[in-house]
Design a protein with these regions (language model features):
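Active-site segments that bind and position negatively charged phosphate/pyrophosphate groups
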Residues: 54, 58-182
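A glycine/threonine-rich phosphate-anchoring loop and its flanking beta-alpha core
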Residues: 1-64, 159
Length: 185
């Protein structure tokens, strides 16, 4: 990722630059099994947020990238609970590791305007209270944000409900969006 957060005396400042992109990242599922459950949960929530904050865009004609983002979201939704239930599940960690890499490398933002409102809100909250883990803060902010903005583009949220969360197939877009947000919680 080209992004970082600097925390200093109760404030958090986000920065972004190609100059801070790592030259290499080693994604070794054998190492993930030692993570505490709270950090597994927080990491999964951060992955979901990184994709959603690109996916929930009003930019048109992003079908290919949308499909890839939806596949990554489905993977994280499927395997996140599995690694939490069994941190030694190597195969599930392989899926999470790859999906997480794509979630953070910017590929799902290709050709679209991105919205980082949830991250901006969460940085303020955890800057004020440093005991709040970033991903845990996002787990609270994301569904609330979704509920507040889904009326702006109900079709996008209905697509998310149907294609990612597997709900709302027979509902109109507004109802499907509400079902998808509830399932996401």
């Amino acid at each position: 990722s080209i992004r970082a957060v600097i925390t200093h005396h109760g404030t958090k400042t986000g920065i972004g630059s190609e100059h801070i992109r790592p030259k290499a990242a080693f994604i070794n599922p054998e190492r993930f099994s030692t993570l505490p459950a709270i950090h597994i949960s927080a990491g999964v929530c951060d992955m979901l947020s990184h994709i959603c904050e690109r996916y929930f865009s009003n930019t048109a004609a992003t079908d290919f990238v949308d499909g890839q983002a939806e596949a990554a979201l489905r993977t994280i939704v499927k395997f996140g609970p599995k690694v939490l239930a069994d941190p030694s599940n190597y195969d599930a960690w392989c899926q999470i590791g790859l999906a997480g890499s794509f979630a953070h490398n910017g590929i799902f933002g290709l050709g679209r305007e991105e919205d980082w409102a949830c991250h901006a809100i969460e940085h303020e909250i955890s800057g004020w209270n440093e005991s709040i883990i970033h991903g845990c803060g996002l787990a609270v902010v994301m569904p609330a944000w979704m509920q507040q903005v889904c009326h702006v583009n109900p079709k996008r949220f209905a697509d998310f409900a149907r294609r990612v969360m597997g709900v709302g197939e027979d509902a109109d877009d507004a109802a499907a969006a509400a079902l998808g947000i509830e399932a996401f919680k």
